[in-house]
């Protein structure tokens, strides 16, 4: 399993994705098809936290007047399943690894992942 979750309107997602060979990856545009409960569980198994998968930059937070500080893990899960914009993106997911968001350290690890993948092929 190799999946990338992104938004087609997100230039950051597109820029990050363009840096890698995604030929054998399933590419999912979240607005067209949101993450499923099963996929979110797979992500959670690796991160151990729904909050780590939650985008605190989502415009839905302000629109729904959500106080993020009061949310519990199940709240983060439910919100991500309810609206695509609550999932931090892009998400690169394999059976054993996950890379979430556009933070510098995450992107460095993602680059290392792809470099090592090419070394073993």
Model regions and ranges:
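Thiol/selenol-based redox catalytic cores and closely related redox-interacting motifs
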Residues: 33-121
């Amino acid at each position: 399993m190799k999946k990338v979750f992104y938004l087609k309107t997100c230039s950051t997602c597109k820029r990050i994705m363009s840096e890698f060979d995604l030929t054998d990856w399933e590419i999912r545009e979240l607005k067209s098809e949101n993450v499923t409960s099963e996929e979110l569980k797979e992500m959670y198994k690796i991160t151990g936290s729904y909050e780590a998968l939650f985008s605190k930059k989502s415009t839905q937070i302000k629109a729904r007047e959500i106080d993020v500080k009061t949310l519990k893990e199940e709240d983060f899960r439910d919100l991500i399943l309810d609206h695509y914009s609550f999932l931090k993106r892009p998400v690169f997911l394999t059976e054993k690894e996950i890379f979430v968001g556009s933070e510098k350290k995450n992107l460095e690890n993602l680059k290392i992942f792809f470099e090592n993948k090419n070394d073993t092929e």
